[in-house]
Amino acid sequence: YLYSRQMVLVRADSDIATLADLAGKRVAVQATSKPETVFLERPEPERVPKVGEVYCFSSMEEVYSAIRKDFVDAIAGHEGAMRTFMEDSPGSWRILDQSLLVSGLGVAFPKGTNEILSAQLTAVLQEMQKDGTTKAIVEKYGFDPDQFFLGRGGSS
């Protein structure tokens, strides 16, 4: 139904402008997160360079502290978490245009169960997209609808 994006955040005055610019840099992530996997296992080495150090913390608060105190050059996490963090200090931070990772989201039920509920949920979500409700919700929370909906972008 929707896309979920993992993004990279840097200081507003950072010289890091693209994922390629992360080569050799220090990056903080939350342990066991998708960004941790991307930086440590590098499933797409042509898109995501080898960084200098990956610091894995148990909470996003620790990740935020690492960049606030200049211990790292960048942090990575879910777009919503990055945007919420930015609200505390407008103008101090920016999110890179390139997504670190884009995942399609949906709702799943065990096979052979909840067919009626599944059909009802699908119908309601489709109606919400048609009448603009979903777009309004996405915009209310500071996201770009063109990057959020399956079939409408989200590939950056």
Where are these regions (language model features)?
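Periplasmic-binding protein-like
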Residues: L2-V10, E87-L125, D144-S156
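Extracytoplasmic
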Residues: Y3-R5, L22-G24, K34, K69, ...
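Beta->alpha turn/N-cap motifs
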Residues: A12, Q30-S33, S59-M60, A76-R83, ...
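Short helix-initiation/N-cap motifs at beta->coil->alpha
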Residues: S14-D15, V54-S65, S103
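Immediate post-signal peptide segment of exported/extracytoplasmic ligand-binding proteins
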Residues: D15-R26, R152-S156
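Extended ligand-binding regions for polar small-molecule ligands
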Residues: A20, K25-R26, A31-K34, V107-P145
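Ligand-binding cleft/hinge of the Venus flytrap
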Residues: P35-F57, M86-P90
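A ligand-binding cleft/hinge motif common to bilobed small-molecule-binding domains
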Residues: V38-E41, A66-L101
